[in-house]
A protein has these predicted regions:
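Charged interaction scaffolds used for protein-protein
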Residues: 1-10, 31-48, 56, 68-136
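Generic hydrophobic, helix-prone segments enriched in Leu/Val/Ile
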Residues: 19, 47-51
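Active-site- and interface-proximal helix/loop "cap" or "latch" segments in soluble metabolic
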Residues: 26, 50-55
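Short capping micro-motif at the N-terminus of alpha-helices
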Residues: 13-15
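Short, surface-exposed, low-complexity cationic segments
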Residues: 17-36
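Alpha-helix-centered segments that form part of catalytic cores
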Residues: 59
Length: 136
């Protein structure tokens, strides 16, 4: 169980199998070469959105992870927490990604997405360097 202090209250979050099943079914893609077969990939998309700083994705991830926990935090309370000047939003993103990196159910996919994003970033930087060198 993971916790964040939200509106002066410790709120629990569970990034286990229930979380994984729920978030995965939010986004599905067709499986290449297989007619009428789809694969649930919601966690992959959500991790990528978190890495991009998508605040809506952050609220969705926290809301799903709090399902079945006590106390249950509402989306309205999460919105208030995110909007508060006292909230360090970068820290909330870091902690949430940290939870996803360490929970057994989400660790491998999260680390894989982070690795892929880093590879793409390095490719883009290399292309930019090549363009700059070609222009010089």
């Amino acid at each position: 169980m993971y916790e964040l202090e939200i509106n002066e209250q410790m709120v629990p979050f569970n990034f286990g199998m229930g979380f994984l099943r729920e978030i995965n079914k939010r986004t599905s893609i067709p499986v290449e070469g297989m007619q009428n077969v789809r694969q649930n990939v919601g966690l992959r998309y959500s991790v990528a959105k978190l890495l991009d700083g998508d605040v809506e994705a952050l609220v969705e991830v926290l809301d799903i992870a709090n399902t079945g926990c006590d106390p249950r935090v509402t989306k309205k309370a999460l919105d208030f927490f995110i909007d508060s000047e006292d909230t360090d939003i970068d820290e909330v993103f870091e902690k949430t990604l940290g939870f996803l990196k360490t929970a057994n159910a989400t660790r491998n996919v999260t680390l894989d997405v982070i690795k892929e994003v880093e590879k793409e970033k390095q490719k883009r930087e290399a292309m930019e360097r090549m363009k700059m060198e070609a222009m010089a």
